[in-house]
Amino acid sequence: MKKILLIALAVGVIAACKQNNKTGATESNKNFAALTDQYYEEGLKLSPLSATFIGDERYNDLLPNDGSVAYLAESKAFNQRFLDSLSNYDRDNLNDNDKLSYDFLKDQLEMNIEGFKYHSEYLPFNQMFALPLTIGQLGSGTGAQPFKTVKNYQDWLKRVSAFSVWADTAIGNFKKGIQNGIVLPKSLVVKMIPQMQSMIVSKPEESLFYGPINLLPKDFSTDDKRRLTDEYRALITTVIIPTYKKLGDFLQNEYLPKARTTSGWSAMPGGAAWYAYLVRQQTTTKKTPEQVYQTGLNEVARIKSQMDSIKNLVGFKGDLKAFFEYMKTDKKFMPYKTPKEVLAAFENIHQRMIPNLKKMFAHAPKTPFEIRQTEAFRAASASAEYNQGSADGKRPGIFYVPILDATKFNITSGMESLFLHEAIPGHHYQISLTQENTSLPKFRRFGFHNAYVEGWALYCESLGKELGLYQDPYQHMGALGDEMHRAIRLVVDVAIHTKNMSREEAIKYMMDNEAISEEGATAEIERYMGIPAQALGYKTGAMKIRELRNKYEKELGAKFKIADFHTEVLKDGSLPLSVFESKMDAWAAKQK
C-alpha cells in the first residue's frame, strides 16, 4: 500500500478538529478547534501532494522541495509551534472527542520532532518509496492528479516544472549521505537505476507523461488543445526526460560505487537508535526491537503448526518446505492465461462474500471501487496495493494488482486474503468510511497510523471463514501463508536492522517458512531494507484488534455484536494503538 505510505509520511498528522460537542461546546473546545483548524490549513501548504491525494485541489500546482534546508527548518518549526500551543490547553477540560484529538496530536508531533535528529533527507528515495515514481503516477493522466479542466492541465505543468529542482536537491542530499556514511545498500540502488532509465524515451509521445494529452477532454477548444499539446511536448523534452536521465546517471555513476554492501540500518552511524525510533513510530507503541522480534518468533511457530495441519489434511507427503515448493510450482495452481482472467477472479471473490459482509458490517462505503492491473512502468517493483479514492467520491478507490505474467499468477499465493486486506473490507472500507464521515474532524478523516491502518487490514484477513471464503484448503493455506508472511516480517525486519542478518539470510529465512518465490522474497526483503520498521505495524495492529475482540466477546457474552464492534473500531478514524485501546475499552464498558 505504497500510496497510503506516501500519505502517511507526507500528511501524517495534518489535522482539523471542527466538531459538534453534544454536551455543549466550552470556550476551551472552541479555541482548540480553531488551533487545529489553523494546523490543518498550514499543514496542507507544507504537503501539497497530500492535498492532491485527498482530493483538495487548491495546491495541485505545487511540488515542495522537501529535502531542502529551508523546507526542513520550516517543517520542524511548524511541528514545534503547534506542540507548544498544546500546552495552553488543559486536556481535562476538553470534551471526549477533543481529548482524542489532543492525544493524537501530542503523540504525533512529539514523534515528528524527535525524528528530525535523524537525517532521513540523506536518503531521499529508494526503489519503493520514491517521488520520481509518484510523479509518474500523477502525471500519467489516470492517477490522483485531475485532468478535467484547462486549469488542471496548467496546474500539472507548474507542478512538474519544479521536478528538476527537487531532483537537484535529492542528488545533493545523496552526496551528503555519502559524506556522513548514510547510504542505501547496493542491492536497492541497482533496482532504482532502471526505474529512472525507463522514463527516458526518444519521442515525447512515447512518454508516460504524454497520457494527459491522449486524454484531452472533447470540450476543450481547438486553441487550448493545440497550446497544451505543445507545452506538454516541450516540458517532457526539456524538463522531465532530462531530470530522469540526471537521476539515473547519478545513481549509476556516482552513488552505486559508494552504496553499502551491508543490509541493515545499524550499519550506519547512529543507525541503531534511528531504527528503535522507527519501531516506536510505526507500531505506535513503546515496544523495543527485541520485543517485536520475540513476538515474531512465537507467531512463526504458532502459524507453522496450523500449516502442518492443512498439509496433512490434503494428504501431502513431505515436509512443509516441500509442500511450499509443490504449491509454488505445480501448474494446476496457475490456471490463468490473461491479466483479465486474474482481475475477474478477484471480482469473483468480492461477489462471493457480499451476503456475509452485510451481516458483519453495518455500514458500507459510498466511494466507488475498482480492480485494476498495475501500470507496466512500475509493475516489476510493485506489490498489490490499494490507492484511496477521493473524499467526494469522484475518484474511486483502486485495488492494483501487478501481473507480469498471467500464466504464472498462482492461486495459492493467498488471493482471497489479499483481497480482504487490500480491498474489501480492509483498506477500502476503513479509508473510505473514514473519509466519507464528515462529522469527524479532518485529521481523523485523512490521518494515518501505520499500525492502525495496516493492522485493520491484516485483521480483515482473519475474517475469511466468517465471510464465506477459505473453503478451499489451498486458499486457507494461502491465508495462513499471508499471516505467516507478516509474522516473518517481525523476525527479519528486526534481524536485518539490529542483528546483522544479511539480505541473503533474510531471503532464505522467508523461503524456508512460507510458500514464496525467490523473486517475491527478494522484493519483500529489499522493501524492509529500504523502509525500515514499516512492515512491523501490520502484525502489531492486527494482534491488538484481535486481542480486544476476544476480550470483549468473553466479557460481554450475548451482548457482543460483531457489526457494532467493527463500527466502533472504524468510526473514530486512525489513532495510535494506546489511544485506540482506551477508546475501545470505554465502548465495551458501555455495552455491559
Model-flagged regions — what are they?
Residues 4-12:
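Sec-dependent N-terminal signal peptides
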Residues 17-592:
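N-terminal maturation segment of proteins
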